[in-house]
Amino acid sequence: MLLPLYHAWACLCFCAALVLGGYVLVMMYGSVGTVRRRRDYEEFEVDVPPGSLGLPVIGETLQFMAAIKSGRGFYDFVESRRLRCGRCFKTNIFGETHVFVSTATSAKMILNNDSGKFTKRYIRSIAQLVGNQSLLCASHQQHRHVRGHLNNFFSTCSLSAFIQQFDVLIVKSLDDWEHRGTVVVLDEALKITFKIMCRMLLSLESGRQLEMLQEDVSIVCKAMLAFPLRLPRTRFQRGIEARERIMSALETLITQRRLARTSHEDCLNYLLSNDDETECKKDPKLTTGEIKDNILTMIIAGHDTTASAITWMVKFLGENETVLDKLRAEQVCFAKKMSGRPFLKLEDIGEMSYASKVVKESLRMASVVPWFPRLVLQDCDIEGYKIKRGWNVNVNAKSVHFDPAVHDNPFEFNPSRFDDESKLPYSFLGFGAGGRTCLGMNMAKAMMLVFLHRLVTTYKWRVLDPDSTLEKWALFSRLKNGCPVLVTRLAEETTDALAD
Ligand code: HEM
């Protein structure tokens, strides 16, 4: 998840390296002919994955940057090499060897990590922003400890308490869409998911405190894509300052909660309530530092991803009338069934069979987190090739999602492909897999389902701009145009007809 960020700031280094690159190239190899011989030699190595390491120093960084700049995203870069070299290939980006794998079997081996040969990449500048006790940066031991506590909170029973709150918030947010006519879905979804995350984590719903937090989180997110230069007014330094403000606001909130001993229905309350329990040597409570770093991590990891996923889902549905009709029929029937009961419950979500497949199919097609980077800790074999310690291996989720050998007609938006429960394991990687599977997976699915239910039973919409260009240098796969749609309220006769 962090590799794209690393590449973002590394691109600045790269520009400087470009100037030096030509010089170094000539100095190191003397002539272009020598460079060619080196590349030819690499291609004939038998036991390492195929693929070119490109030019000395700069590798294939130029091509990588061009793919990202094109707006089609990094997938183009990976896909052209996959077609040429096969499902396991190597390249060199920003001076490091990267191996890309795109089979469900390799995904299983790397993400499950039973051999302990892989670890999530640690990037110092990211750790400075989210905190080194964050799940994204913690050591193996600390990760297990923090994850254990958070897993308990994210269990189904906590989710059940939040469904109604999601629903109230979504109904309120969707209420004024019809008066606006044109709505940019991504902008609206970002507001909704930020509020939901802050409600669920800290019981913050509105007011100046929420606005300030949103501003600061956005500064931290932008800093993740910046060159990590700690000079006054640099983007990175502004991110560090925003982090400090967030930490201090969380510190105040935690102190107030401890002093007042008031109870709230939120994640912070859950983590602090462990304060009262007898100290357990095996699994001690989370420290204030761990709590603060991970609240920030969850806001960052949860709101942008879910908002992007919602946006793609609205686009795919808007462009696939048959699927939308089938979904609307399911949801309108459902709405009639629960008439008299104003808000949704966890059990309702469990009954939304087709809608759940729509969510899954949207995540497959969108591949919001397109690849998962890991660092190789020991030499190993993948797909019959030798992989060296210190290399990066990337599980290329998007290629698995679009592999015709795994998913029939992969470019068709067809939720019914998930009717068959016995699908190849690890063929759907929308939330990752193994010990690093998305912590908020169930929560994200629930948010998407509640949103979907309210949207399709209240509105019809038309996608105004079908452009699928990706936002450049965004944290996740986000639509550049944000998906503008024209919204109109559904006529009552339509919903009545569908329910009959
Ligand atoms: C549709 C929305 C979401 C998508 C597509 C998504 C996707 C992912 C993926 C693919 C990973 C694994 C990355 C890897 O293995 O390298 C991940 C990790 C993570 N996600 Fe999500 N996520 C979503 C929503 C959320 C939400 C709502 C939260 C809120 C808690 C969240 C918190 C996290 C955290 C903390 C991690 C790191 C887990 C760890 O390393 O142990 N995500 N997410």
List the model feature ranges, each with a label.
Residues C15-V26, G95-K108, N132, H149, ...:
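Hydrophobic mid-domain F-helix/FG-region of cytochrome P450s
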